[in-house]
């Protein structure tokens, strides 16, 4: 771990502006001034919620360069990847015969399957390069962990990613990416109920600001 989960989440907020920028460059998408303000307000709320620790928990701003570069790459890559996924679905949709237009609704799931195959190839290559097959085998033998991992894979990379691609079918990638960046807000209540994690006023404030920012997209 180079920069920690909170800084990692903060760098991931680069995804919405990256998606908006490259959506404009590649797809010609435009956002209204109100939508851009909504994006800024939403990301501000997320930032406040992520850095919810009190004064007794000091946060060092002296981050390693490699961690910063990986964080920026992750955030920008997430945004650009969403734009490229939409481009791929647009090309495929344009090639579908008129009598098969009903299959358009299945495009996000087909695109998710393609992304999953590519991801699997990438992870296998990474395991080969780093020589971690023994640790991978040990993880597979942990039944409880594999059970939870299976459910996490089903709800996240399958259902979550498919719905995210469905979202970009019907709205601009910048708006869809901003809504997807709300994960740190959505996990506040489950983390409190399931793991008894205390909820601070800064988390609540960040959630309220984020909800207000999202509302600007729809009013």
How should these model regions be labeled?
Residues 1, 9-12, 138, 210:
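Short amphipathic alpha-helical coupling elements at transmembrane boundaries
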Residues 1-3, 44, 51-72, 76, ...:
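Membrane-interface interhelical linkers
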Residues 6-10, 33, 110-113, 175-178, ...:
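Signature of the 12-TM Major Facilitator Superfamily
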Residues 8, 23, 82-86, 164-165, ...:
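Interfacial helix-capping/hinge residues at the ends of transmembrane alpha-helices
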Residues 11-25, 118, 122, 159-160, ...:
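Alpha-helical transmembrane segments of compact multi-pass small-molecule transporters, enriched
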Residues 17-76, 80, 192, 198, ...:
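Juxtamembrane helix-loop boundary signature in multi-pass membrane transporters
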Residues 78-97:
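Membrane-helix interface motif
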